[in-house]
Amino acid sequence: MPYTKRYAAWCAAMLLASMGVHADEARRNWGNDPFLQISTALPACPEPLGPRQTEREWLAEAHYRVERGNSCWVEGRCRLSNAYRYDAEIAQAVQRRIDTIEPATHWREQSSLWLLLQRRFIYVQGCVAPGFDKAKFLFELAKTADVERVIDHTTTDAHATSLPYKTLADPLRQPADASE
């Protein structure tokens, strides 16, 4: 009987220790996905988690990334063999594009935004001013060469209890709309 209690105590200690290790596990951009902060006009805006993952999260997603990346090639929609290979080119093109659309959209002075580029998708994350013409900005951003889709994960309330994206400050909290 004492052996069983000791074993149970040891198991509980190991479980608690492993939970702590995984909670504090370092996050990094394992896939080298472009992640750009493009504006800082709203200083209270929480920084998105972006592509930063633990190694465990990265490994769990690896097969899914391969399938998603290769599907456009298999379907004949991509000139490159993997959709993720477009991301570096798109990052350069999007920098030029946002500079071009600034006079028409005034996004710099009305937002704190980050762009995450993954497999020809642009995830727009961060905060926008209530009067900001977000639809026009997203429409213009979608005109960037090789972009398949622009996904809006922005908020007008930086202090909302639930944001449409994961934050660096609280990476385990699920976004308000986790449909993507």
Model-derived segments and spans:
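N-terminal targeting leaders
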Residues: P2-A13, G20-E180
